[in-house]
Amino acid sequence: MDEDSKPLLGSVPTGDYYTDSLDPKQRRPFHVEPRNIVGEDVQERVSAEAAVLSSRVHYYSRLTGSSDRLLAPPDHVIPSHEDIYIYSPLGTAFKVQGGDSPIKNPSIVTIFAIWNTMMGTSILSIPWGIKQAGFTLGIIIIVLMGLLTLYCCYRVLKSTKSIPYVDTSDWEFPDVCKYYFGGFGKWSSLVFSLVSLIGAMVVYWVLMSNFLFNTGKFIFNYVHNVNTSDAFGTNGTERVICPYPDVDPHGNSSTSLYSGSDNSTGLEFDHWWSKTNTIPFYLILLLLPLLNFRSASFFARFTFLGTISVIYLIFLVTYKAIQLGFHLEFHWFDSSMFFVPEFRTLFPQLSGVLTLAFFIHNCIITLMKNNKHQENNVRDLSLAYLLVGLTYLYVGVLIFAAFPSPPLSKECIEPNFLDNFPSSDILVFVARTFLLFQMTTVYPLLGYLVRVQLMGQIFGNHYPGFLHVFVLNVFVVGAGVLMARFYPNIGSIIRYSGALCGLALVFVLPSLIHMVSLKRRGELRWTSTLFHGFLILLGVANLLGQFFM
């Protein structure tokens, strides 16, 4: 009787991994042919022939009680989703509705979903990275890093397919790491994933402080009819400035001269509206309460703003390049007064930025699950990376080439290229305001992801209590405030966090998993070992280069 009372839709355990979904390969429902359904009622009576077939399913269920997956019914005997019925011990059958299945996207939607996910704050630092590496070497590094990260992402995507006799349809990359390396693999992937998320939140805090400062400054100057002239900048309608020409690049503000009705008003405003001394603390009042929301579904509605902001940035870059023209002069190894060499030893700073700019490895499996044509996953992933790489090249090359040298030196290009335009620039003001609102809605989403990953692993609950969540949020916000106060250089923050999380999730873990999988199948060759070992060394060198270059 105990055997008969077991539900026919019971899940099949597979070692330490347990799947709890309606996937037909994992769940073993009872199938009733349409001709064996008697009547058209909501609860349709099952014929005697169907009842006999039910007994066979009971027999299979006894076999599948074993941990050996080979005793499970073969996949080809499981009917298609639209023909599945669930048999009840009461003698009734219910048709499984397909409405709860995830919507599959065409390839074009999948490609732009990947593009939109990768287009983050790193795009603002690409021109600065090209300046650090040199114009020619910078372009080469963008192409090479795009190819390397694409291959590693391909290895992540294929990692679930190389595991035999286990249903991996709902697995993520941390599950794959746990399968191959146990608890160490799972926790290491989790820690480095948190590094990338918290690093992004710190960059967001610095940028939001920057955008709020410049937005408030624009409004104040407009209301009080104050004209500011930066001491270091070009003349003309399309002004470009050099905020830190001869001072510490992590200083608080650029040199500005006020002219208006009341100079003391401007000085008082600067005292209470400081980019590093006050603005980072003002943001606490706005963002800390938002982080404590139990659900982030409200903020998820504004994710489309990311696409709009990137499109506007592309328009802004194109317009500025047309207005300013190109200013290039090639010096291959020696610098001049206004230009940098084409090849510089600071190139690891660009590779660190690009590691995060091309980083999507921790969620690529999830994104590709919704692709309508799974056989095109590799092609769509490659096209998405091509689109991302072209976007970075377009923005980086145009800003670097259009930067007016002379009279300004290329060394003046800031880690956030919007800082090279005065706060009075209307088009840049629109970009800053738009990005400020967009980041205000995305920041709680990032905090929610940090909470889900960390609290879910430690407490088994995404919201164990208000106190736990509040302490975590205070820690994350505190990290952002400290960086915005003492080190507001988003280029360096991005490159350090990118190189650190990229070492594990981009270079080491995908390569090790692929080599271990080949070794277990007896297919590992010395050429594969050499190539993937070289990738691991590149990841280590990329991280070390951030500290020594």
UniProtKB/Swiss-Prot annotation:
It is found in: Lysosome membrane; Late endosome membrane. It catalyses: L-leucine(in) = L-leucine(out); L-tyrosine(in) = L-tyrosine(out); L-glutamine(out) = L-glutamine(in); L-asparagine(out) = L-asparagine(in). The keyword Translocase does not apply. Residues 1-27 are annotated as: Disordered. Glycosylated. A motif (CRAC motif) lies at residues 445-451. The chain crosses the membrane at residues 108-128, 135-155, 187-213, 272-288, 298-322, 345-365, 383-403, 426-446, 468-488, 496-516, 529-549. GO terms for biological process: amino acid metabolic process; amino acid transmembrane transport; asparagine transport; cellular response to amino acid stimulus; glutamine transport; L-arginine transmembrane transport; L-leucine transport; positive regulation of TOR signaling. It is a multi-pass membrane protein. Residues 1-107, 156-186, 289-297, 366-382, 447-467, 517-528 are cytoplasmic. Arginine binds at residue 122. Changing residue 85 to A: Loss of L-arginine-enhanced L-leucine transport. Changing residue 87 to F: Increases arginine transport. Deacreases affinity for arginine. Amino acid transport activity is increased by sodium. Transport of L-glutamine, leucine and tyrosine is increased by arginine binding. It holds the Pfam family Aa_trans. GO terms for molecular function: amino acid sensor activity; amino acid transmembrane transporter activity; arginine binding; cholesterol binding; guanyl-nucleotide exchange factor activity; L-amino acid transmembrane transporter activity; L-arginine transmembrane transporter activity; L-asparagine transmembrane transporter activity. A motif (CARC motif) lies at residues 432-442. Belongs to the amino acid/polyamine transporter 2 family. SLC38A9 subfamily. Associated component of the Ragulator complex. Associated component of the Rag GTPases heterodimers (RRAGA and RRAGC). This is Neutral amino acid transporter 9. The gene is slc38a9.
